[in-house]
């Protein structure tokens, strides 16, 4: 007799419906016991999602308090003060991913909230060097190529410019 025939039905194929318990949050709220808690947790999908969100927010608040010394309420005050956007690019609004807390690495002072691109690649790459940004402003206002060869439109951009 093959070994597979001797075994009992696999764990996954057993009917576990009888083992499911009602959601503990539904029971606590007095809701009808129609929603089962999915294995392995004690909550239905709706309450499990709420629990995960609450746990995520709590751990985030604990982390920013330990790392930057600001509370979740102070974070949201800064967020509102900045108009709900990254202070530098004004594009990112922190809805999909929370804005990063930016701080001065030399003094430790919290400066504001920035998107990942501005915090990591703009300020991080420049290493908080003010001269870097002065050169960048000068570069945008007075490009060196224009000084040397005059205004010349790149062929890749010529088609776009002629259509407008």
From Swiss-Prot:
Gene3D superfamilies, sorted: His-Me finger endonucleases
Pfam families linked: Endonuclease_7 (PF02945)
Protein's UniProt name: Gene 59 protein
């Amino acid at each position: 007799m093959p070994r597979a025939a001797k075994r009992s039905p696999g764990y996954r194929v057993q009917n576990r419906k009888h083992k499911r318990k009602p959601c503990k949050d539904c029971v606590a709220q007095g809701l009808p016991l129609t929603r089962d808690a999915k294995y392995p947790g004690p909550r239905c999908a709706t309450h499990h999602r709420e629990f995960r969100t609450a746990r995520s927010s709590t751990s985030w608040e604990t982390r920013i308090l330990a790392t930057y010394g600001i509370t979740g309420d102070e974070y949201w005050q800064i967020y509102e003060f900045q108009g709900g956007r990254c202070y530098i690019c004004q594009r990112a609004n922190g809805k999909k991913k929370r804005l990063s807390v930016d701080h001065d690495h030399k003094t430790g002072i919290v400066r504001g909230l920035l998107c990942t691109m501005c915090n990591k690649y703009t300020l991080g790459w420049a290493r908080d060097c003010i001269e870097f940004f002065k050169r960048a402003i000068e570069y945008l206002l007075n490009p060196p190529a224009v000084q040397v060869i005059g205004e010349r439109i790149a062929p890749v951009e010529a088609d776009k410019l002629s259509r407008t």
